[in-house]
Amino acid sequence: MWELVALLLLTLAYFFWSKSKTCGAKSPKSLPFLPLVGSLPFIPRHGHPHVNFFKLQEKYGPIYSLRLGSTTTVIIGQYQLAKEVLVKKGKEFSGRPHMVTLGLLSDQGKGIAFADSGGSWQLHRKLALSSFALFRDGNQKLEKIICQKASSLCDFLLTHNEESIDLSEPIFNSITNIICIICFGISYENRDPILATIKSFTEGILNSLGNDHLVDIFPWLTIFPNKTVDMIKKNVKIRDEVLSGILEKCKEKFNSDSISSLMDLLIQAKTNADNNNTSEGQGSNAFSDMHILATIADIFGAGIETTASVLSWIIAFLLHNPEVKKKIQKEIDQNIGFSRTPTFNDRNHLLMLEATIREVLRIRPVAPMLIPHRANSDMSIGEFSIPKFTPVIINLWALHHSEKEWDQPDRFMPERFLDPTGSHLITPSLSYLPFGAGARSCIGEVLARQELFLFMAHLLQRFDLDVPDDEQPPCLKGNANVVFLIDPFKVKITVRQAWKDAQAEVNTWRP
């Protein structure tokens, strides 16, 4: 009996202690919620989630919470608060909440993108960043690789002159090959079946993640048959089989004196860890084959469909705004001409092109809602208390479409990134984070910026891109997903007359 009384007293003491600890703490305003289902009945079901959450700010403010099942999640839609989470308190908010679907993608939190903060995540992120240093000079210089793939894409399009085609597949293949060179030191021919396989499992995973996932809110639902979960498992299995085959080939030819890819760096780290030739806390457990595959899969997921999607968005907006395309081509003609192909140094002169890229990244961000963060301890955001383990989601769409930060935010206006004279690039608002910020920022930002600029400069130097005859410009609504995708559309490809004339002149002078 006395044991029962003691237990009761301890329970009451803990209750009053916890109440006193949170007494006076201010929580963000919350959506209504019901037992079991939480706020689900009060979240708009039609339209893009990022737009719906942005609209909810009108009632609940730039930071608010909602219940997903029994879990309280905080939504951030203001730059100052987002910067606090991502940068000022980036370490404290660097955690990742466990989600069924993301766990399936990452073999339960391995790799970089979906891994919780900790030693393994830091190691793999550091190695991924180090891989870009392998491509600084010589024939393996990153810019040279990108230019080669951009030129190959242009050569392919020359065979489709005056035709209307969907550019998504050739663009996807070009970007995939760049990532394959970085990851494995391998490039594939356009007709190689492995490219079709990569495209298939990538699209399969993205399409699966685009569905509503009640299993992420109610994990116990996994005991029942679930088509979405089955589809994710199927495509992840194919992905891992492809990457495992490449990993084994890389192991066979591995030479510690010739490190030329991210896979080599990971294999080297694994070898050092296995031989205890590593720092304390960096053991071989962090470099199992599944850890390596998860990291490579993250680079694939973050580096292929994202860049390919943005290129499609840029082309789509140029089809809607042909006067912008003409301004870019005029810049190319005046600053580069046709005797050479563009380089990244030309970015200082092709200001309208760079401004267009920045505007597309604003108006159609790659990830309208960033992957959820999680508080690693009891924290605060602004004046609000955030308990440990609370998921926090940055609504990037809200940052990029705030009328307080942007003039006519829903209007495509590349000139907003230029000064009044059009001679300098500017940042009109700090509320602009296309690649995130802080410890969880996109590790491929430098690569992506080079790819977007060089591919578009190469394309517009040689071709006119127009709406096909008797067709309408592409729909700009897009499909909300982990990556913000545009619906497939066709483009009429026409070799520019100025390019033809320049090539004819070159041929005339050849002996």
From Swiss-Prot:
GO cellular component term, pick one: endoplasmic reticulum membrane
Catalysed reactions listed for this entry: a C21-steroid + reduced [NADPH--hemoprotein reductase] + O2 = a 17alpha-hydroxy-C21-steroid + oxidized [NADPH--hemoprotein reductase] + H2O + H(+); progesterone + reduced [NADPH--hemoprotein reductase] + O2 = 17alpha-hydroxyprogesterone + oxidized [NADPH--hemoprotein reductase] + H2O + H(+); pregnenolone + reduced [NADPH--hemoprotein reductase] + O2 = 17alpha-hydroxypregnenolone + oxidized [NADPH--hemoprotein reductase] + H2O + H(+); 17alpha-hydroxyprogesterone + reduced [NADPH--hemoprotein reductase] + O2 = androst-4-ene-3,17-dione + acetate + oxidized [NADPH--hemoprotein reductase] + H2O + 2 H(+)
This protein's UniProt keywords: Endoplasmic reticulum, Heme, Iron, Lipid metabolism, Lyase, Membrane, Metal-binding, Microsome, Monooxygenase, Oxidoreductase, Steroidogenesis
Transmembrane segment boundaries: none
Cell compartment(s), UniProt: Endoplasmic reticulum membrane; Microsome membrane
Disulfide feature: none
Cofactor(s) demanded: heme
Pathway this chain belongs to: Steroid hormone biosynthesis; Steroid biosynthesis; glucocorticoid biosynthesis
PROSITE patterns, per database record: CYTOCHROME_P450
Summary of activators and inhibitors of this protein: Regulated predominantly by intracellular cAMP levels. The 17,20-lyase activity is stimulated by cytochrome b5, which acts as an allosteric effector increasing the Vmax of the lyase activity.
Keyword Cell inner membrane attributed: no
EC number: 1.14.14.19, 1.14.14.32
First-tier enzyme category under EC: oxidoreductase
UniProt-listed Pfam families: p450 (PF00067)
A GO BP entry: steroid metabolic process
Gene Ontology MF: a single term: steroid 17-alpha-monooxygenase activity
Protein family according to the UniProt entry: Belongs to the cytochrome P450 family.
Name of protein: Steroid 17-alpha-hydroxylase/17,20 lyase
